[in-house]
């Protein structure tokens, strides 16, 4: 951040002060962590594998390795707050599926901003007796080192068991060749084959499908209209969704829990598996051996008791997210604390936190047109007026002249007869639209044409939500070295770890032009469905609001040639037992949702671990 000498932080930043986290010597004599329940059969202290983070990527590692016989411990800074199914999606309640706008508050309550610039607005109307600050150092968790002009202001994290999968959209598209990282050099067909294998397995873990909304009137209304308008130009389909439809009005949305049941093992259902989950544990650093070739222990802090422990394992896997993986590594001596200095690059992982990417996002909401709404009941024969004696609504099942299938017409007829007070012919519990036209070279952005809850975009009570269609288009960003995530040696976050700071701008040239083209595309396309909702006109959203941060610990074939941190098995260069998982591995410019791709890379990583590390023997309880 560029500061002037009149800014109080200017002089402070030039001092030799270091935060407690930056000063802290790496302890080497921490006690081992006791088991969560010493009565659990087969429990002991040393593990085959420790996993940091309990989101879908951590659960992918857990599933693959626990089922292969490894003794696994998982640590998460968050607590269990998703009910009986640990790490389950919080939208899996009837209440939120009946009123999706209520779920907005859940998302907002879960997200914690990563880097907030100092608010320099002075409250000069306080009582003269009240204490008043004379500087702009740190207040309300703000970051005085963050340049507001180079921030990802919308970037946030979720600190609960299950991570963001407890409130995500469940969109799981595959990347095409243009977006994917290469796993096989100089052989596109072989690369396609390995990706197809990985994607297929990941989709089975997530229960990804493209037919959960086949019998939604609103979904088909939007899908068919767009397919007609763009016939021969664009292909429209349902968004690939990690979800299972349980009945016509209820969907079970997938989450970390879908990938792996986070119950401790051994248990009745898995008597020969070994797994333990430790919530509310801050993982502070990994300890390197003297030769910098392996990790010897993980240092953690119990957030409830305040006690610190050293955890030993054969394999260490960090899946705490693109920000926190990088934060933990920097706090462990990888990369470097403090503002990046090109003249003095770090020795370990010099590209850590460089070349970061985040998608551009355009958003609007439309109210469906009268033409579309009237077409819903086009097969109905209507006699009389609603509420009057003799009013009837009927249709001819199977008639060749019908524009809609019988399931559609039956729903409309029943609704119009049973709810004559409703001016809309769409049933109250009709599922929302979930439409996309996928990323393609001619239109290199991802689209979500749907009705869902985000941290923004709630609809006021005066507008019937059945009429609303959300439009979210995601644009790719070229990786540039100057776009960085770095960590302060002076400021700490709420968990006493080095404060993350962004130095980011969308690059000029291709990235910026595609973002502008994407906005135009959304405006033209959305106008074919209806008029804009007041207050939700087409707009670019805050950088980072997509929450698809990537490239913080990039993947490649060669550390120096590819400017990266991990190889194609997600193993940190130079270390035989340290692995990183998540979107931070993805080094490419991508527009689509990255979770399925990150999960696929985790599956490949597990294949390497299983080939190179042997599970410890399992001793059944006596």
From Swiss-Prot:
Catalysed reaction equations from the record: D-glucose + O2 = 2-dehydro-D-glucose + H2O2
Pfam families: GMC_oxred_C
Residues where substrate binds: 448, 450
Cofactor: binding details: Binds 1 FAD covalently per subunit.
Cofactor(s) needed by this chain: FAD
Keyword terms of this UniProt record: FAD, Flavoprotein, Oxidoreductase, Periplasm, Signal
Localization per record: Periplasm
Primary location group: periplasm
Residues that bear Tele-8alpha-FAD histidine: 167
Enzyme Commission identifier(s): 1.1.3.10
Residues annotated as the enzyme's active site: 548 (proton acceptor), 593
Summary of subunit composition and partner proteins: Homotetramer.
Family per similarity comment: Belongs to the GMC oxidoreductase family.
Protein name per Swiss-Prot or TrEMBL: Pyranose 2-oxidase
Organism: Trametes pubescens
């Amino acid at each position: 951040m560029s500061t002037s000498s009149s800014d109080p932080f200017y002089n402070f930043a030039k001092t030799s002060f270091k935060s407690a986290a930056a000063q802290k010597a790496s302890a080497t004599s921490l006690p081992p962590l006791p088991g969560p329940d010493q009565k659990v059969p087969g429990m002991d202290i040393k593990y085959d594998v420790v996993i940091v983070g309990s989101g879908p990527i951590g659960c992918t590692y857990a599933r693959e390795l626990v089922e292969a016989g490894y003794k696994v411990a998982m640590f998460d800074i968050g607590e269990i707050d998703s009910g009986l199914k640990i790490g389950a999606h919080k939208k899996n309640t009837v209440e939120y599926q009946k009123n999706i706008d209520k779920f907005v508050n859940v998302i907002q309550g879960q997200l914690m901003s990563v880097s907030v610039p100092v608010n320099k607005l002075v409250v000069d109307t306080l009582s003269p007796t009240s204490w008043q600050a004379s500087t702009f150092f740190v207040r309300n968790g703000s970051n005085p080192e963050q340049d507001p002009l180079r921030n990802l202001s919308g970037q946030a994290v979720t600190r609960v068991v299950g991570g963001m999968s407890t409130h995500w959209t469940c969109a799981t598209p595959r990347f095409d060749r243009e977006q994917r990282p290469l796993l096989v050099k100089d052989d596109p067909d072989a690369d396609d084959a390995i990706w197809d294998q990985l994607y297929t397995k990941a989709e089975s873990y997530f229960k990804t499908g493209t037919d959960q909304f086949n019998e939604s009137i609103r979904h088909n209304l939007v899908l068919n209209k767009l397919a007609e308008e763009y016939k021969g130009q664009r292909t429209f389909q349902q968004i690939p969704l990690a979800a299972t439809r349980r009945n016509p009005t209820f969907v079970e949305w997938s989450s970390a829990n879908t990938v792996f049941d986070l119950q401790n093992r051994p248990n009745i259902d898995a008597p020969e598996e070994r797994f333990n989950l430790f919530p509310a544990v801050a993982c502070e650093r990994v300890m390197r051996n003297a030769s910098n070739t392996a990790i010897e222990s993980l240092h953690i802090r119990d957030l409830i008791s305040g006690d610190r422990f050293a955890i030993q394992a054969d394999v260490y896997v960090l899946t705490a997210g693109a920000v926190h993986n990088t934060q933990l590594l920097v706090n462990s001596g990888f990369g470097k604390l403090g503002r990046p200095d090109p003249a003095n690059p770090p020795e370990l992982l010099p590209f850590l936190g460089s070349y970061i990417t985040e998608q551009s996002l355009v958003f609007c909401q439309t109210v469906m047109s009268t033409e579309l709404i009237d077409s819903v009941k086009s097969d109905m024969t209507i006699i009389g007026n609603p509420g009057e004696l003799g009013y009837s609504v009927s249709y001819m099942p199977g008639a060749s002249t019908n524009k809609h299938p019988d399931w559609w017409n039956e729903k409309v007829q029943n609704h119009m007869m049973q709810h004559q007070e409703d001016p809309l012919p769409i049933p109250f519990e009709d599922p929302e639209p979930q439409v996309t036209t996928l990323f393609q070279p001619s239109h290199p952005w991802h689209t979500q044409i749907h009705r869902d809850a985000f941290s923004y975009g709630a609809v006021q009570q005066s507008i019937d939500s059945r009429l609303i269609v959300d439009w979210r288009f995601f644009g790719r960003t070229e990786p540039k070295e100057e776009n960085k995530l770095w960590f302060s040696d002076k400021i700490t976050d709420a968990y006493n770890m080095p404060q993350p700071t962004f130095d980011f701008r969308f690059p000029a040239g291709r990235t910026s032009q595609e973002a502008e083209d994407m906005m135009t595309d959304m405006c033209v396309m959305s106008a074919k469905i209806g008029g804009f909702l007041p207050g939700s006109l087409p707009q670019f959203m805050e950088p980072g609001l997509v929450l698809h941060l990537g490239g913080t610990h990039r993947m490649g074939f060669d550390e120096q040639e590819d400017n990266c941190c991990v190889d194609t098995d997600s193993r940190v260069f130079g270390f035989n037992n340290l692995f990183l998982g998540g979107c931070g591995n993805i080094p490419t410019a991508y527009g689509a949702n990255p979770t399925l791709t990150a999960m696929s890379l985790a599956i490949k990583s597990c294949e390497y671990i299983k080939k190179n590390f042997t599970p410890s023997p399992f001793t059944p309880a006596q």
